[in-house]
């Protein structure tokens, strides 16, 4: 039997990387199982592990000596390491925008430090943490370098700042400047801290 539907270029969908992730979550983080209401469902656990893997890479490469993962009763997860921290300087991306290293690493799905030949075994070859970020309602990132704290938050992979701490449903102001990071003096040792607040879900 011959199909009646026409087949032309309009039949082919071109999705953005973010849209593709939303439609193919199970390919990245596996299928959901168990109690979907549990704060640490299988997909969320896999997503958080991608961020942990990046921290483990830093320690495995000799750039740090500590990784700490904290699971809070309210459902939030915090990942900390004593490595170098994501680069906070700015450079041009493939679209001609000036972007921070933090945005490159966590906001652009196709980017990663493992593509230059110096990668290590853990993670989804440099794209896992960015995929986690794009599928999270909220992700707070702090990088400690040179006596300063560089901070930014993300909502579905978009950089900006929330009106209140810890609430994934708080008002969100999107950053038009992808190179911007909030900087304050902080003498804590170098490293990185990523926080998934309570209620963070894999969409």
Predicted regions and their residues:
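Short beta-strand/loop element within the Bergerat-fold HATPase_c
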Residues: 66-74
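GHKL-type ATPase core
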Residues: 2-11, 75-101, 112-203
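Bergerat-fold GHKL ATPase/HATPase_c domain
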Residues: 1-49, 92, 100-107
